[in-house]
Amino acid sequence: MAGGGPRSRAELLTDVILTMFRANNATLAWGDRIVAPLGLTSARWQILGAIVQADRAQPVAWLARDLGANRQNVQRIVNDLEKDGLVSFEPNPHHKRAQLIVLTPKGQETYDAAIGLYGPRVEALAQDLTVEDLDATHRVLTALRTELETSAAD
């Protein structure tokens, strides 16, 4: 701010949002480098992770909702994963057209390998960050996400 006066919350939040955009891009590129040897991208890895984390098989629309992603983009990635033998489609007893997405044994092996590559790298990345800073960052990002999702529903 010109004059060196105190910055408003909106100005500070704008800086946070711009930093989040840059951090997101850097994180995706970092993830791409980690999983490239496995034939994955960050986007494919994220979908595999959502499938692993789900308590049961889900249709694409549910995965997209859980990820906060566009259903069509998730469908395209799931189709690619299916072509590569990492996921399969199963009938959904509750909906004829919305098939359930299931990880194949090859998909589980690939996901496990990705986590194996990720572990040492995330440990190294976290090395100079305090637990308190990470907790505070998580709280702020969670609050922002909640507010954005709530305001998007209005």
Describe each model-derived feature in a short phrase.
Residues 20, 48-51, 141:
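Hydrophobic structural patches
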Residues 25, 29-70:
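N-terminal helix-turn-helix DNA-binding core of bacterial DNA-binding proteins
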Residues 1-38:
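N-terminal leader segment of winged-helix/HTH proteins
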Residues 1-8, 131-154:
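C-terminal regulatory/oligomerization modules of transcriptional regulators
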Residues 15, 46, 135:
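Active-site phosphate/pyrophosphate-handling residues
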Residues 2-3, 28, 59, 79-139:
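Charged, amphipathic alpha-helical coiled-coil/dimerization segments
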